[in-house]
């Protein structure tokens, strides 16, 4: 999924410039991506589309996020730490964090990693045309580097 998202970010200015899902799926197949990766990415994009009513503005509520038992059973501690870091740095709003967590909970537990959370965060921020602080953006973009080689051309 990471490579598919990197491809989308590289080839489309933003979420709105992507073709409809069925056309995008064919385009990604022609680009050589695995159908399972394409399906997972399209599912995550659908979650984002259905969550578009959330605010992209970072909230300054200072509220503490309490994770449910299901979330603590599935989300690694490092992922929960990343979510807290992104809130503290005002890189994502509380609503955006909830969308990311919701998307992560749709992924098999053994596939949930910090890099997966970073990539989903990038996908969400790209979809919302959000600006990021440089250091936070660099940290998130590091997830798009596989085997120390950029996936984007």
Swiss-Prot record:
- Domain of life, per UniProt, equals Bacteria
> Which family is annotated?
Belongs to the Smg family.
The cross-references to PANTHER family, in alphabetical order and at most eight, read: PROTEIN SMG
* Name used for this protein in its record: Protein Smg homolog
Q: From what organism does this protein derive?
A: Neisseria gonorrhoeae (strain ATCC 700825 / FA 1090)
Organism classification = Bacteria, Pseudomonadati, Pseudomonadota, Betaproteobacteria, Neisseriales
């Amino acid at each position: 999924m990471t490579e598919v998202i990197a491809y989308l970010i590289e080839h489309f200015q933003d979420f709105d410039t992507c073709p409809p899902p069925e056309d995008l799926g064919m385009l990604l197949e022609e680009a050589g991506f695995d159908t399972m990766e394409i399906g997972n990415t399209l599912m995550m994009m659908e979650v984002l589309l259905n969550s578009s009513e959330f605010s992209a503005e970072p909230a300054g509520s200072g509220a503490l996020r309490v994770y449910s038992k299901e979330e603590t059973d599935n989300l690694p501690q490092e992922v929960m730490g990343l979510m807290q870091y992104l809130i503290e740095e005002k890189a994502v709003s509380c609503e955006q964090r909830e969308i990311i967590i919701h998307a992560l909970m749709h992924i098999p537990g053994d596939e949930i990693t910090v890099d997966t959370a970073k990539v989903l965060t990038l996908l969400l921020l790209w979809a919302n045309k959000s600006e990021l602080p440089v250091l936070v953006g660099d940290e998130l973009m590091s997830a798009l580097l596989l085997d120390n080689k950029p996936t984007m051309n």
